Amino acid sequence: MTSSTGGGHDARAVAFRRWVRKIYGWEVEVRVESMLEDSSRIGRFGVAFYNFIQKCAPWLHHPYFVLVEGLSYLNRSRVTLGRRYYSEVIRNYKPHLVLSVHDCLNRGYFQEARAILGKENVRCATYCSEYAGGYGYSRNWVEPSVDLYISRTRTAKNYAVTRYKLDPEKIIVRGHFLVPRIYEEKLSAFERHRFITERLGLRSDRKIIFLATGGTGANNHLSLLPAIKQYSETFQVLVVCGRNNEAFMKVRNWKRNNPDLRCHVEGYCNEMHLFMQVSDLVITRGGTTTCSEALHYECPIIFNGLGGVMPQEKLTAKYFLQDESAEIISKPADLERLLMEWNRFPERFRDLKRRFRNMRFKDRPSEVIYDLVDLAHDALPERERPALKVVGE
């Protein structure tokens, strides 16, 4: 179960489906449901309002976050909003595993599935994508009756145990949950040079600043480009605008009027993992998927705090900033200051990159799949459990 609040939750749902297909072929069936927006009008409005806030007024998410926390009481033991749709899905599909990758799809949902199918016939699991604990870590993530709780980091795991009293026996740490191509499509030095010069039309002897955005297109590109332009002899820019066509056209127009700064502009694309490999640093909000790809490819992060930082984004930023492994800006002048410093003292940027590289941890998404499929396997009567064949990894 997922929901399109931002793009990260959907990305992890897609990652689960693709890894299952890669490892087990067609022996394991996966159904992905956008449960919040498909089950009720109120849920659909809440998702749209979240994405509006992310684009236009991140500061407004603080009172919104407090409001959403109330769902933990509303859904304490049953689904309140969208219950009819959810119940129909459970009755018709009869899943052996209900997996939630969204904070608002745990409490009540697991109890409802067990009530319909029988406790012995279904298992329930959560993959929590937060990097750290504290303000922004929603209590809705933690349903105490969960069978398996998967945490991205040990820091976040410890918070779930100490703050929300989750049984330590139910929680494991498994790192990132990225799609298979992230681990498969690694550019060689020659391919990187060719991608920069031919695909992007940029120079291979200048640092590339990646102005990233999520699928919804929240960005401050036009505010940041003038600051980068002042250091056009050292830096060039790769800009992605997501599904924000208005931003795409405005950045394209800015590029035409400012030919001194080398710039490549993209709308929505499926090459983020390639862009990350050719970039020297990325400027992004605290979206967990983009930051996970940046960490995987050792591309240092500047957190975009223009307009405020949303509660969940604070957790990601805190995880990296606590070891001085990233930077954060709240206005364009902050970016200008950083670029001036790195231009005059290149060793300081190298130190940042070294600290960021040290934050990297190894992860094997296939382990998550084995954990979850084994859990689903346990929901079958022992005599009916098929011998699953691994076809790839």
Indicate residue ranges for each PLM-predicted region.
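Nucleotide-activated sugar donor-binding and catalytic core shared by glycosyltransferases
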Residues: 1-393
